[in-house]
C-alpha cells in the first residue's frame, strides 16, 4: 500500500514559515494487479476526477523534474492502483507552449491553462446554493487577476 501526499508550499523556508498551506492526501493505494488498467490503456489518459487521469498527470509532473531526480519515485508510483482517487491534479511547471496548441487529452496541461481546462470539465451543480472555489496563489498579480474574475 502507498499514499500520495501533496502540499501547497514551495520547498523554501519563507513559504513554510510565512504562508498558509494546505495538504491533500490520497486514499491508500494498493499495488496494481496485472489486470488493472494503467494510464496508457485508457484513451487520452482518462477523465478529470478519475484515478487514471490523476496518475497520468502526477507521473507527468514528476517526470518534468527529470528522470535523474524523480525517476525512482515515478517507477515506484507507477506500480500502484490509483482507481480510488477522485481528484484532479493542478500543478505548474515552466512551459513555452502556445495556448491554442494545447490538448489535455494528449498531454498534461500546467498552470493557468490547466485551471481553465479543469473548470471546463467540472459539471455545474444543479441547486440554488452558490458554489465555491478555494485557491492558493502566491503571486499578488495572479491573485488579483484570479480573485476579481467573475467567470
Kindly give the residue locations of the regions a language model identified:
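Conserved short internal alpha-helix adjacent to the catalytic or cofactor-binding core
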Residues: 4-6
Amino acid at each position: 500500500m502507498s499514499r500520495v501526499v501533496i502540499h501547497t508550499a514551495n520547498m523554501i523556508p519563507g513559504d513554510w514559515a510565512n504562508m498558509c498551506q494546505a495538504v491533500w492526501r490520497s486514499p491508500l493505494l494498493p499495488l496494481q494487479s496485472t489486470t488493472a488498467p494503467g494510464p496508457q490503456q485508457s484513451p487520452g489518459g482518462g477523465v478529470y476526477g478519475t484515478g487514471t487521469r490523476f496518475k497520468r498527470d502526477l507521473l507527468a509532473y514528476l517526470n518534468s523534474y527529470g528522470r535523474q531526480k524523480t525517476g525512482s519515485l515515478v517507477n515506484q508510483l507507477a506500480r500502484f492502483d490509483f482507481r480510488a482517487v477522485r481528484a484532479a491534479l493542478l500543478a505548474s511547471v515552466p512551459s513555452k507552449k502556445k495556448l491554442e496548441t494545447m490538448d489535455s487529452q494528449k498531454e498534461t496541461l500546467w498552470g493557468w491553462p490547466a485551471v481553465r481546462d479543469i473548470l471546463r470539465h467540472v459539471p455545474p451543480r444543479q441547486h440554488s446554493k452558490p458554489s465555491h472555489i478555494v485557491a492558493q496563489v502566491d503571486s499578488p498579480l495572479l491573485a488579483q487577476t484570479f480573485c476579481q474574475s467573475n467567470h
